[in-house]
Amino acid sequence: MKLLPKILAHSIDHNQHIEESRQLLSYALIHPATSLEDRSALAMWLNHLEDRTSTSFGSQNRGRSDSVDYGQTHYYHQRQNSEDKLNGWQNSRDSGICISASNWQDKSLGCENGHVPLYSSSSVPATINTIGTSTSTILSGQAHHSPLKRSVSLTPPMNVPNQPLGHGWMSHEDLRARGPQCLPSDHAPLSPQSSVASSGSGGSEHLEDQTTARNTFQEEGSGMKDVPAWLKSLRLHKYAALFSQMTYEEMMALTECQLEAQNVTKGARHKIVISIQKLKERQNLLKSLERDIIEGGSLRIPLQELHQMILTPIKAYSSPSTTPEVRRREPLLMESPSPDCKDSAATVTSATASASAGASGGLQPPQLSSCDGELAVAPLPEGDLPGQFTRVMGKVCTQLLVSRPDEENISSYLQLLDKCLVHEAFTETQKKRLLSWKQQVQKLFRSFPRKTLLDISGYRQQRNRGFGQSNSLPTASSVGSGMGRRNPRQYQIASRNVPSARLGLLGTSGFVSSNQRHTAANPTIMKQGRQNLWFANPGGSNSVPSRTHSSVQKTRSLPVHTSPQNMLMFQQPEFQLPVTEPDINNRLESLCLSMTEHALGDGVDRTSTI
């Protein structure tokens, strides 16, 4: 460390090995064995303008005239910065640096003795850092230390396009040839994080490129808005930045070779290509769903497929052979407005009641109704995914209007309509048609009695739980505890929980004893339903079952003491399993009323066995 200052002083005084001395000094600054004091002393050779008149510079045999000249130059440089408010980048560089260069060339220690790169690199960082941070104040002597210390860990041979005259690493002929234009005009301004011998400008340019880059996810009508969610569902969302630079057509034409060129891993490449192939097959899938719906199949699977498809990227269809004006008129020509659909809504709704009453599951293929009659006139062109989607939605609407009401399907269809109405791929005509279908289905949904919907939900609960369980019937505690008050409403509410479509006759052990358990009637013994209903004898005799029955399935005969009058009462033909839904509801209410009357009658004449 004692030898290094002598070498540097000799190199500067004799203008020899300037570049090698600079590299040696930079290596010494970044060497881990260099102490903090040594680093501070070595840094003065490169950067401290204020300390030029100090003892360290005096020991290097520097002339006092250079210090005076530097002081005047530095003052002029600061004055120019303060007057211009640092708004003129070129002016601040020319006024501060080039004048100092011309003054230095006039002195005995001119540009040839190596002082230009040494001195200029000390004054410019303050100016550049001031511009980068958009401040109009001149940094003090202490403020000049921060860029110097940041530059300690950087390697010297790097090209520094952002460092004015600190490209003192350039040849002196280049400096003289540039004259008043000491810096090339294409240099980018330094960012606040940049420093001497830094390549930070590359990072800032990269950020600027990213901000100005195209992002198709945010473009209207690009069809790419749903790509991030689609990639996330495939667990490939880390490649979203790659897709954001593509158009819809480029994405659909992606190949494994193109993805490999973008450094996409093999597994992800394969998954992306397969997923794009599925996107290409969506129109054929919609045609297949349309055929299934027309043939009267279940709507649940098509609705699930449509829900998954609406989340994938879909672009509005535009015919390549037509002008934009014709494209706007084409939907109006192909799809006429649907006043017939609205006018015939009442007809379809009225036909729905009779159709629902006669339909029990398997449906005949429906005639083309007002919902999809217009859409089936002409085949849709290849690639018209929104049009094909709208056609399938019309088929689903027709099936919902003429088939047995299903709350889940209707709710799922309405949710799907809401997604379509806000999707950018559908035309205004298609959205008007979808809105018309939504109004029809909502009207049909509101026309159903709530009791029917409760029965349907009860039927689903019973189907999910299975048979032979006691969850769907009133428990002994709920019914037996209410018997003391003789509240008829309790029996009516309890009876409504019984599923209507799989109605078995009620086991009434709850009306007889609070210890006895209830189970639903098994379909295998529904023919013996008359044996599953036990009532207290209205005639007044104390007819109690001879033993406690834990399960209805174990009971294949009536209790011993059941009277013949009870048997005759349940042998009426009206108590057979009804066929239609309204009859089920009416007869279920009649059964509940009959049960309530018997229970209240036993309580009045005090002959009840409960």
UniProtKB/Swiss-Prot annotation:
The region annotated as signal peptide is none
Query: What keyword terms does UniProt attach to this protein?
Result: Cell projection, Cytoplasm, Methylation, Phosphoprotein, Repressor, Synapse, Synaptosome, Translation regulation
Record InterPro entries: PHAT_dom_sf (IPR037093), SAM (IPR001660), SAM/pointed_sf (IPR013761), SMAUG/VTS1_RNA-bind (IPR050897), Smaug_SAM (IPR037634)
Query: From the Swiss-Prot or TrEMBL record, what is one GO molecular function term?
Result: translation repressor activity
GO cellular component: a single term = P-body
Q: Which organism is it from?
A: Rattus norvegicus
From start to end residue, where is composition biased (Polar residues)?
467-480
The taxonomic lineage of its organism, from the top, reads: Eukaryota, Metazoa, Chordata, Craniata, Vertebrata
- Describe the function of this protein: Acts as a translational repressor of SRE-containing messengers.
Q: What is this protein called?
A: Protein Smaug homolog 1
Q: In which tissues is it expressed?
A: Expressed in brain (at protein level).
One of this protein's GO BP terms?
A: regulation of postsynapse assembly
- What are the transmembrane regions? none
Q: Where is this region: Disordered?
A: 177-222, 318-366, 464-487
Q: Which Pfam families does this chain map to?
A: SAM_1 (PF00536)
Family indicated by similarity: Belongs to the SMAUG family.
